[in-house]
Regions:
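N-terminal secretory signal peptides that target proteins for export/translocation
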Residues: 1-60
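Bacterial N-terminal signal peptides
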Residues: 65-78
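Sec/Tat signal peptide C-region and signal peptidase I cleavage site
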Residues: 79-84
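Metal-dependent amide/peptide-bond hydrolase catalytic core
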Residues: 85, 316-512
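Divalent metal-coordination and catalytic microenvironments
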Residues: 107, 167, 206, 233, ...
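Histidine/acidic-residue-rich, glycine-tolerant segments that coordinate divalent metal ions
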Residues: 152-153, 189-201, 207-208, 220-342, ...
Length: 512
């Protein structure tokens, strides 16, 4: 079968190669054909810059090779080059784009809530098995919740001695009704853990993450001659519930499977155009702690507040008072957020209730700052109750849900810098942006273990139509963001960049 374009090189050729899809078809003087590397390995290389440095290759070939012999030796001896590796990866990604887009649309149309990712995990497991990975399903144990199944998936591909690298994705979706109008939009409705019927949507891009992981898994399975070590593909459930990473670790993730030297992940973002990636060394995302506070009083008739102790008034003062924690007690060099997201109290206009319940979220980078905020919340609640004459038997109840706590995400600076250089080489310097940290949270941080024993890095993947982002910046009207019913990444450039960047990162960490 004829190849798209064939270049024939004389023995003395040292010049540029035309860009585009090529296969090198070398002929001996007698006319006997030397089959191309495309024929040998089923690959067609894309040469974007169009220059083949035979001088560099000659230095790695046996002494005395001519230009032609050097080229042939390098093609058939498996000598890798950065340009050759990139050309191979580019061609493979382009070949797989139709399949990746189909996978993404299927996942987007069939989201599953946290703790219920049964079909999604089974799909990922099946895809990894088909690629030759050794797959273990149902990894994850949720302490105190025997009714939740562990839907974590671990796929291992061993390739000789070398580092162990984990690539992680999330599996779950959100209770959001999709309003994108896409032809593959989710129409799923189901019951959540509380038994309420809700709509479900991949409103945080985990479908992009899953597809990128599967694409990366395929690229690396086909490029095994260019890396060595143990590659682990990790599909984590219940990220949105901040419980899946801990569940997998509690189920022996690092004892049942090889302990990683590095763990890497990506996350789509509305802050960048599709085709770009972002890196954030050091603190990248905040810790998250949910707090419930019950302010108690003495109920009574709304017409006679003087004989009651009004917890609604307590709550009003408390909400205002805690605004001073960040502004007056926290150092401006230690970012923190205290947000009251829910207040519930009372049933009728003429009844003073016995209690008011508040729900808060705390976000910090440093653990000592988090502990100080928790102490300040207790102190202020007690002080306001005392000022209202609340008896000690009705003191406020302040409860921090440590089971719902997620530590701050700290990207190992050295690993992040290394990946940043890889991305600049693969995507171009203009397509790699250093992003500031944010106060959002997620549980990827747990894979580093305590005291940051394992270097981890989560980088950001641009997912927005460049023109829409430019218009947003001109007009000041934000594009739909994560967790929005309108969140709709641009699939093709986002997936192309996700697979290329993640595969290149692994190849660098596991290079021979």
């Amino acid at each position: 079968m004829p190849l798209p374009w064939v270049a024939r090189f004389p023995d003395t050729y040292w010049g540029p190669l035309p860009p585009g899809l090529i296969a090198v078809n070398l002929h001996r003087p007698q006319g006997a054909t030397v089959t191309s590397i495309a024929d040998q390995e089923g690959m067609v290389r894309r040469l974007e810059s169009g220059i083949l440095n035979l001088e560099l290759l000659r230095g790695r070939a046996p002494r005395g090779c001519s230009a032609l012999a050097c080229l042939v030796w390098c093609l058939f001896s498996g000598v890798p080059s950065a340009r050759g590796q990139q050309a191979t990866l580019d061609a493979l990604v382009e070949r797989e784009m139709p399949s990746l887009l189909s996978t993404y649309r299927s996942l987007h149309a069939a989201p599953e809530l946290s703790h219920h990712e049964e079909k999604t995990s089974a799909f990922v497991a099946g895809e990894l098995r088909a690629l030759g990975y050794t797959v273990t399903e149902h990894v994850g144990k949720y302490a105190g919740h025997p009714e939740w199944s562990g839907y974590g998936v671990v796929g291992v591909l061993s390739n000789g001695q070398g580092p162990t690298v984990y690539v992680r994705t999330e599996l779950d979706a959100l209770p959001v009704e999709e309003m994108t109008g896409l032809p593959y939009a989710s129409k799923v409705r189901t019951k959540d853990d509380a038994g309420r019927e809700v709509s479900v949507m991949h409103a945080c891009g985990h479908d992009i993450h899953i597809t990128s992981l599967l694409g990366t898994a395929k690229m690396l399975a086909e490029m095994k001659e260019q890396w060595h070590g143990t590659l682990v593909m990790l599909a984590q459930p219940a990220e949105e519930a901040i419980s899946g990473a801990k569940a997998m670790l509690d189920d022996g993730l690092y004892t049942r499977f090889p302990k990683p030297d590095f763990v890497i992940a990506l996350h789509d973002t509305p802050a960048l155009e599709a085709g770009k990636v972002g890196i954030t060394p050091g603190y990248a995302m905040a810790s998250s702690t949910s707090v419930e506070i019950t302010l108690r009083g003495i109920g009574g008739h709304g017409s006679a507040p003087q004989v009651a102790k009004d917890p609604i008034l307590e709550a009003a003062e408390f909400v205002l008072a805690i605004q001073t924690i960040v502004s007056r007690e926290d150092s401006p060099f230690d970012p923190a957020v205290v947000t009251v997201g829910s207040i519930h109290g009372g049933t009728r206009p003429n009844i003073i209730p016995d209690e008011v319940r508040l729900q808060l979220t705390i976000r910090t980078y440093k653990e000592e700052v988090r502990q100080h905020i928790l102490e300040a919340l207790r102190r202020m609640a007690q002080g306001i109750a005392a000022a209202h004459g609340i008896p000690p038997s009705l003191s406020p109840i302040v409860t921090a849900d440590e089971s719902d706590h997620s530590p701050a995400l700290y990207n190992d600076p050295q690993l992040t810098a290394r990946l940043g250089q890889v991305f600049k080489t693969v995507l171009g310097p203009d397509h790699v942006v250093e992003l500031p940290p944010v106060m959002a949270s997620e549980d990827f941080c747990r894979f580093a273990l305590e005291d940051r024993q394992i270097p981890i890095c989560q980088f950001s993947l641009g997912a927005v139509d460049p023109e829409k982002l430019r218009e947003s910046r001109r007009s000041g009207v934000p594009v739909p963001g994560l967790h929005s019913s309108l969140w709709a990444p641009v699939p093709e450039p986002t997936l192309r960049t996700g697979v290329k960047s993640m595969t290149s990162a692994v190849l660098d960490l596991m290079k021979k």
